[in-house]
Every structure is written in C-alpha cells, then in structure tokens.
C-alpha cells in the first residue's frame, strides 16, 4: 500500500504535508525493527542512554520556535501555548535522564526477618528493574509533542524501544521528534513511527507478539477497547483516558479569581485538554455574580489564527469534532439550557464559538459526557453535598478543583471527590510532569509522570542467592 494521507491545518484547511498510509505488513516490519532496536538500547550502559536524552532536551530548546510553529499549524494550538509545550517536552527528556538511575537501582531485602523459607539467614535477596521490550505509544492529537515525550523518554531511559503511532490529525510532530532523537544519537531502530488509519493498522500495534506494553492517551471508549485486547494477550498497559473535570466554586471564594481561572481552564486550546475544567458547579448564592464575571472574561478572549501572537484560542481539530459540539448545544437547548455565545472565530477553519450553557442540568450531554471543545456548562447547587454529588455524577475521575477560602471545608470536600487529583484554589489544568498523573473510574489505568511511567515500563525481578 503506497498511498499517502494529507495533513491539513485545522485553522485554514490548507494541506501542510502528507504521511504514508502504512499497511499491516509495513507496520509489522516496523515492530520487528523496533525489537532489533530494543536489543541495542537495552544493552547500552545507562549513562549512554541518559546522555542521549539530555541531548534531545538541548535540541528541543534550540528548535523550540520551529517546532512550536509546526504545532500551531498542525494542531491549531496558539503559538504561545505551543512554545510552552515544546519547552515542557524538553524538560520531560531531561527529567527522564535524571530519574532513571533512581528507578533502576533495585533493592536489597532483609529476608532474615522472615521465618519461612527456612535458613533465610544464609540468603541474600535483591531485585532489579528490567525493561519490558517494545512499547507501543499511541498518541492523542492535542499534545503531540509533550505526549511523545511522556511516553518515549521514560521508555528509552529504562531500556525499552518504542513504536509510536501518532494521531492521524497530528503526525508531523512525531516524525520531527523521531528525527531529533536520531540526531541526538539514538539508534534509528529504537524509535519507529507508524502512520495510518487506526481501523487499518491499530490492531497490529496492539496485538503483535513482540509488543510488550501499550501506553495510550485518548478517549475512554477507545482506550478500554485497546486495554481489553491487550490484557487478553498478557500485555502491560498504561491508559490515560477521558475526563470531565469539575470546578466547584463555593460562596466564600474569591469570585473574580475563580472566574478567571475557570475561563482559562475551560477554553484554553479550544477546550481540547483532557484535564480541562469541563463542568462548572457554583453555589446558588453567588451564581449570578460568578456567571457575570465569567462572561466578561470569556468575551475578552481572541479566537483566531494560532500563529498570531495575540490569539488566545484556536480551532477545534476537525469537522467531526465541530459536529459533536453542535450536537451538545442542540441537546442543551432541548433540555432547558440557556445558550450564550461569548466569542467567535473566523469563518474559514474549524473554529467553534466559545459557548456558555447557563442553568445546565444532569440530563444534558454537556454534563454526562466528555465534551472536547469550548462549551462551558454551569450548574447551580444549594449545598456542598449537592456540589459533591454533581461532581461525582459521571463515569470519569481525572482531576477536579475547589475554590474556597476555608481550607478545612476544602479538605473535607476533597475526601469525597472521586478524582485522581483535587486542586484547591487553582485550575484543573495543573499538571506536574514528574508527579503521578491519572484518574479514578474510567479516566485511566495506571499513572503517567516520569518516575511512575518508568516503573510501569519495567518488570521487577527478584534474584535470590543462597550462601553455601
């Protein structure tokens, strides 16, 4: 199959490149090549692997502007945000180099503390962490560079090779990242990038016998399907799945600050972040005041060309996404929601207006599903208990936020929230690249974060020595 797939910019629909539409046979060949890469990279001394990762970090800093412009054009991410993503990716490669020795150092166990088996006083037991082999990394469209870093850098650090399958919407960034790794000294076979449609090659990167672990970031439905196939074959998995993160605003909070943070948490990158503040839950006593502040701040956001330095919000990724968002709006209208358009973008491109749903309720798609776009449903509640109930009402549990000046109250509520993180007086968008990141319920399986990813990507082997 020698066809190619055109890559179009979501901001103007122009063709910006093309990638190979790989066949299953071609993907099998790439996986086999990656296994050869594993045999090379796993035998490299750790200092050589970390030297490569540090070099990648340096190149990313040097190439920040070029990569940021590619990211803005390909993913529709505003250029200022794109620069931050490239810089974060650089830091992830550096942190992976720094953390690797700590993760891989193993342990010495005092087995003489146990009566059974007999004669433990004559034994030494140690453990080592060993690479799994070939890791399949399936990337989302929304963070093609930083997600590449989070999945590839820890894998290489601990001695795995990687097959990267980028989103078909944003494959060019992965191809550039692969080039940078090779420039930094990584064997070409240690990272392979496969491109094509998921319904044609997706099963191959999951079920191939040489693949030992699949790490996926994307929708819950797709992720659970992948997990089911992988686990049935005895493969390891890391799943970073959907989210419908609530922002709870209590009556004693700083309303203006809460509104500013909520606007950015919901509308940044056109609402296409897994940990965007997708549901806003406000105490009835302050709802009108909060909504007025939210409305005015959202109206100040500029929706437009991602390459424009003054742009705050770009387009959604494709027409399918825009259609789904329209369905959410129509559903909200039919179920009693008051719809307000707060800011619009250009006519050309996949620009979706920044939208507010006032008087939202739990029957709406906007509250029941993960809405990947700039739609902000606001729910009024009369008590903290009701706020907790609304927050926990979905199948998702990625991150959450509480705004209040009462720390004791915030901590009590945080105990009841079923989420991987509870952020007090700040955005659901907060993420520390070295700390555990993942969710409860259907928001994920396992955790990302440099050290946690390394642990997930290695096997723990015990070695017992009996002294004779």
Describe every region a protein language model picked out.
Residues 12-18, 211, 248, 302, ...:
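Conserved C-terminal structural/oligomerization subdomain of aldehyde/semialdehyde dehydrogenase
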Residues 11-79, 86, 100, 285, ...:
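N-terminal alpha-helical segment of soluble enzymes
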Residues 109-257, 381:
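Rossmann-like NAD(P) dinucleotide-binding subdomain of oxidoreductase/dehydrogenase enzymes
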Residues 13, 49, 71, 159, ...:
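Residue-level signal for inorganic ion chemistry
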Residues 1-3:
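Short, small/polar residue-rich loop motifs at catalytic or cofactor-binding pockets
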Residues 15-22, 37-43, 136-137, 247-250, ...:
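Short, well-ordered beta-strand elements within core beta-sheets of diverse protein domains
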Residues 53-148, 186, 191:
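N-terminal Rossmann NAD(P)-binding subdomain characteristic of aldehyde/semialdehyde dehydrogenases
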């Amino acid at each position: 199959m020698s066809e190619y797939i055109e890559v179009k910019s979501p901001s103007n629909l122009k063709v910006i490149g093309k990638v190979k539409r790989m066949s299953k046979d071609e993907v099998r060949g790439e996986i086999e090549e990656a296994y050869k890469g594993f045999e090379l990279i796993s035998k490299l001394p750790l200092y050589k692997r970390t030297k490569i990762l540090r070099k990648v970090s340096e190149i990313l800093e040097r190439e920040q502007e070029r990569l940021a412009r590619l990211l803005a054009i390909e993913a529709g991410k505003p250029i200022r945000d794109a620069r931050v993503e490239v810089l974060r990716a650089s830091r992830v490669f550096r942190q992976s180099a720094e953390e690797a020795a700590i993760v891989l150092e193993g342990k010495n166990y005092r087995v003489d503390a146990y009566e059974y088996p007999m004669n433990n006083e004559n034994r030494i037991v140690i453990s080592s962490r060993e690479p799994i082999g070939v890791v399949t990394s399936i990337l989302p469209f929304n963070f093609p560079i930083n997600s590449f870093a989070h999945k590839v850098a820890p894998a290489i650090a601990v001695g795995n090779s990687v097959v990267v399958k980028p989103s078909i919407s944003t494959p060019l960034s992965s191809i550039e990242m692969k080039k940078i790794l090779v420039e930094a000294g990584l064997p070409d076979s240690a990272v392979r990038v496969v491109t094509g449609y998921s319904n044609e090659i997706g099963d191959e990167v999951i079920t191939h016998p040489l693949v030992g672990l699949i790490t996926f970031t994307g929708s819950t439905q797709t992720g659970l399907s992948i997990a089911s196939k992988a686990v049935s074959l005895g493969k390891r998995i890391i799943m970073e799945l959907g989210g419908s993160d609530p922002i709870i605003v209590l009556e004693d909070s700083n309303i203006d600050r809460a509104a500013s943070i909520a606007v950015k948490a919901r509308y940044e990158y056109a609402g296409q972040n897994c940990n965007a503040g997708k549901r806003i839950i406000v105490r009835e006593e302050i709802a009108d005041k909060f909504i007025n502040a939210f409305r005015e701040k959202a109206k100040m956001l500029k929706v437009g060309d991602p390459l424009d330095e003054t742009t705050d919000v770009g387009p959604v990724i494709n027409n399918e996404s825009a259609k789904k968002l329209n369905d959410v709006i129509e559903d909200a209208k039919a179920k009693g929601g008051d719809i307000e358009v707060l800011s619009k973008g250009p006519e050309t491109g996949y620009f979706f207006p920044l939208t507010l749903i006032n008087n939202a309720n739990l029957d709406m798609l906007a509250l029941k599903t993960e809405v990947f776009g700039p739609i902000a449903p606001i729910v009024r509640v009369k008590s903290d208990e009701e706020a907790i109930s609304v927050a926990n009402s979905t199948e998702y549990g990625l991150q959450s936020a509480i705004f209040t000046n009462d720390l004791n109250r915030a901590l009590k509520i945080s105990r009841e929230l079923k989420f991987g993180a509870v952020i007090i007086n700040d955005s659901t968008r907060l993420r520390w690249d070295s700390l555990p990141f993942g969710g409860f319920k259907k928001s994920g399986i396992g955790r990302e974060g440099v050290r946690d990813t390394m642990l997930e990507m290695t096997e723990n082997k015990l070695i017992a020595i009996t002294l004779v």
